[in-house]
Amino acid sequence: MGKISSLPTQLFKCCFCDFLKVKMHTVSSSHLFYLALCLLTFPSPATAGPETLCGAELVDALQFVCGDRGFYFNKPTGYGSSSRRAPQTGIVDECCFRSCDLRRLEMYCAPLKPAKSARSVRAQRHTDMPKAQKEVHLKNASRGSAGNKNYRM
């Protein structure tokens, strides 16, 4: 019984081995060499280095990284720890002419703005204006020596 149940398994192994032998003979060693060379020359995403960003691509990347904070094209004053006055480099020098990564882009983001108080200037009504400012406004309006010309400020 043991020989009958293992017979299909043996036939499968034999046919599969013969199939592999035929396929291996048709692939030459030069084909394998070129295949290995191609696989080694393709960079994988994990090993790909930082890229250069210029023009609109650089601005888009900065807007993506910095979000609502905004960004600077030059390093803010007081940036870095060197005491010497080196020529100031900007984001274009660092990311367009050379490659840069996300950390380098983040260095050019503006600092976070502090949260505004609950009662901001926009939240005030026009009637909340102090009387002194209203009086000055009325005095300026009564000086009609402008010859009926409207000036915008």
From Swiss-Prot:
Matching InterPro entries: IGF-I, Insulin-like, Insulin-like_growth_factor, Insulin-like_sf, Insulin_CS, Insulin_family
C as annotated region, ranges: 78-89
UniProt propeptide residues: 119-153
Region of interest (D), residue spans: 111-118
Disulfide bonds: C54-C96, C66-C109, C95-C100
Family: Belongs to the insulin family.
Name by which UniProt lists this protein: Insulin-like growth factor 1
Gene: IGF1
